[in-house]
């Protein structure tokens, strides 16, 4: 199939084998059910190799660094398993489970290949340069700025790009598909542990995947009430692009880029809690995969090995999604406070202190490894020392406000306005009704002193408290919606197993009602997923990448001067194709630097060289307009690729110039 034509299969299989076998050997020190160990080993190996790659790539060429990370993962597993009886003699391979996992990962990857939605303009540019050695990454649109962002999944994808020769657009989809499939299986493992039922495990995985917002329930309201509600809200973002009012947009298509053959109905979306069927952003489902691994492994190992593995997973979580990491740590604080209040003593139990090395170690690594927390730390050092030589891209700040829920589509929804309650329920979805069962589970976990899982449950508290905050940083106000939506993901982890146990001895009528509730909660996700399936046979690159760009990528990626800047009238295209940075602004999207516009409107090879650009990546219309500006002998034409129609007419063209000698 076409996916295999986009990458080298043997290096990919070898890389996955290093991760899986290394992680499997490490887990010899953990008491795990046989059916869990293989896939947990793959996830652990993937995670450990990513963090090792994040370290080794700072000193070595990425090809060597990435292979070394995989080999080190295997060697660590061999060393840790050696003092015990090697588990080879007890080797069990649940073939059916592995086949189902591989099929699911492949299926999800194919869907991703047919879609280009959510931040590809941001992630593919960064991924392309990371695969060539920009680790820790710098902002692709101005490399003077540190890219203080959650780039764990991009690290995984960068290994696919460099070692398996997958172009960024395929590597990103493969990384998302792989980690999402692991997330769903881990969710099933958790449910099976709680219920002992394979049926509950399968239902829980489906619930985790499909459940999200339930905006369609607004259509159940009387038209007069819906009209009043619509008049009380102001759409923002893609919501405003999709319609003039809430009442009107419910009948419209959702206007977002990168869709497949069929548009998405707006009523199936959510600006607060989209289902995992829409996990096409730069972090995918990687943070949930890591949280589930922490929960499944905590308490299953002993001594320093367990602490080291948990510290690695927690550090990776910080690099995957800083919000999830911060809320997990805050949840641990809330869980401890509940324990202190319950026992009326500040003398904390030994079971809590036993996890201190992992929690503290993960936090220290998070501050040093790169990403958001490293950016915050460098920002503090810069303020104290009066220097901003390592300026971070994102600034974090908050202000207090009256209780409000922020939807990335519907805007601000006040809890003081009863009309907004209907919209809040529609944006959060029906999983919110599991809240009492989840807190009851948290109380039980505290009694049992299962601290890291209790931390996950009580991480709902800081998430819920964000209704009193307004995000005033420079990542956009809707960054707050991810924080508020966090508690809903906690609920989705537990909804099926907790309700399964509660309803097991109840009447069939209640059980059928719960099944109906689950189907209603999953309706939007099922609808969106069904519209994504037709995209599978039609792979795309990205909204800004054409087939001719993919050919230029094959010819020139990784073959130009490292660290050089590229100029392209489409700032995201040149960096993705060539793996280089540009210098166009401090935001994604249209350039913000006036000097960039001056060069674009009046190109001169000498001025471009003085501005720091060595390479120019030019499209057909721009080349036709300004070709005579590049007649100087100092300009070297590295490539002039054209596509022609049957009548000989040029339909697409890319010209790659080197102006490094224009001084």
Question: What is the meaning of each model-derived region?
Answer:
Residues 503-663:
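Extracytoplasmic
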Residues 1-85:
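Membrane-embedded, hydrophobic transmembrane alpha-helices
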Residues 177-180, 326-332, 475-504:
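Hydrophobic/aromatic-rich transmembrane helices and adjacent perimembrane loops
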Residues 87-95, 297-306, 341-353, 434-461, ...:
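Membrane-interface helix-loop-helix junctions at transmembrane boundaries of multi-pass membrane enzymes
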Residues 60-110, 198-205, 356, 663:
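Start-transfer (signal-anchor) and selected internal transmembrane alpha helices
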Residues 272-273, 294, 306-322:
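Membrane-interface alpha helices of multi-pass inner-membrane proteins
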Residues 102-287, 539-543:
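Active-site lumenal/periplasmic loops and adjacent helix-entry segments of GT-C-fold
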Residues 288-298, 331-332, 336-343, 356, ...:
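Hydrophobic, aromatic-rich transmembrane alpha-helices
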């Amino acid at each position: 199939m076409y996916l295999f034509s986009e990458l080298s299969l043997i290096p990919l299989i070898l890389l996955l084998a290093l991760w899986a076998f290394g992680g499997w050997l490490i887990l010899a020190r953990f008491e795990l059910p046989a059916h869990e160990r293989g896939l947990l080993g793959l996830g652990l190996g993937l995670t450990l190799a990513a963090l090792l790659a994040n370290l080794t790539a700072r000193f070595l060429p990425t090809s060597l660094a990435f292979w070394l990370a995989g080999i080190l993962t295997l060697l660590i597993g061999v060393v840790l398993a050696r003092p015990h009886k090697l588990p080879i003699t007890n080797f069990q391979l649940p073939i059916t489970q592995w086949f189902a996992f591989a099929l699911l990962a492949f299926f999800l990857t194919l869907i991703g290949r047919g879609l280009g939605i959510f931040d590809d303009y941001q992630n593919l540019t960064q991924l392309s340069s990371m695969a060539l050695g920009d680790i820790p990454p710098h902002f692709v649109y101005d490399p003077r700025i540190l890219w203080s962002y959650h780039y764990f999944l991009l690290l995984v994808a960068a290994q696919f790009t460099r070692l398996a020769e997958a172009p960024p657009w395929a590597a990103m989809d493969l990384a998302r598909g792989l980690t999402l499939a692991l997330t769903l299986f881990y969710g099933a493992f958790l449910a099976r542990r709680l219920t002992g039922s394979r049926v509950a495990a399968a239902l829980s995985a489906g619930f985790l995947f499909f459940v999200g917002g339930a905006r369609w329930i607004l259509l159940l309201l009387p038209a007069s009430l819906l009209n009043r509600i619509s008049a009380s809200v102001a759409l923002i973002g893609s919501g405003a692009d999709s319609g003039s009012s809430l009442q009107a947009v419910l009948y419209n298509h959702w206007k977002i880029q990168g869709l497949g053959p069929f548009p998405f109905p707006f009523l199936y979306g959510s600006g607060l809690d989209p289902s995992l069927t829409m996990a096409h952003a730069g972090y995918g489902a990687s943070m949930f995969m890591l949280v589930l691994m922490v929960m499944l492994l905590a308490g299953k190992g002993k001594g320093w090995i367990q602490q080291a593995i948990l510290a690695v997973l927690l550090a990776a979580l910080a690099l995957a999604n800083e919000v999830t990491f911060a809320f997990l740590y805050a949840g641990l604080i809330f869980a401890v406070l509940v324990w202190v209040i319950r026992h009326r003593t500040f003398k904390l139990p030994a079971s809590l202190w036993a996890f201190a090395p992992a929690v503290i170690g993960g936090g220290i690594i998070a501050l040093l490894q790169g990403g958001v927390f490293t950016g915050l730390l460098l920002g503090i050092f810069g303020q104290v020392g009066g220097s901003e030589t390592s300026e971070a891209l994102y600034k974090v700040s908050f202000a207090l406000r009256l209780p409000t829920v922020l939807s990335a589509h519907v805007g601000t929804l006040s809890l003081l306005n009863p009309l907004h309650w209907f919209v809040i329920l529609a944006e959060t979805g029906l999983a919110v009704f599991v809240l009492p069962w989840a807190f009851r589970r948290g109380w039980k976990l505290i009694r049992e002193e299962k601290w890291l899982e209790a931390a996950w449950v009580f991480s709902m508290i800081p998430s819920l408290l964000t209704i009193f905050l307004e995000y005033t940083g420079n990542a956009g106000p809707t960054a707050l919606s991810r924080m508020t939506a966090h508690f809903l993901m906690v609920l989705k982890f537990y909804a099926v197993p907790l309700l399964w146990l509660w309803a097991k001895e109840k009447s069939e009528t209640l059980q059928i009602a719960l099944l109906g509730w689950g189907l209603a909660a999953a309706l939007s996700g099922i609808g969106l997923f069904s519209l994504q399936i037709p995209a599978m046979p039609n792979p795309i690159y990205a909204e800004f990448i054409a087939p001719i760009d993919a050919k230029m990528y094959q010819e020139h990626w990784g073959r130009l001067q490292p660290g050089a800047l590229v100029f392209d009238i489409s700032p995201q295209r040149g960096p993705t194709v060539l793996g280089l940075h540009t210098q166009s602004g401090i935001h994604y999207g249209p350039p913000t630097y006036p000097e960039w516009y001056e060069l674009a409107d009046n190109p001169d090879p000498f001025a471009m060289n003085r501005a720091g650009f060595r390479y120019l990546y030019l499209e057909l219309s721009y080349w036709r307009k300004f070709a005579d500006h590049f007649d100087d002998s100092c300009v070297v034409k590295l490539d002039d690729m054209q596509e022609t129609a049957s009548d000989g007419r040029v339909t697409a063209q890319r010209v790659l110039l080197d102006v490094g000698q224009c001084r």
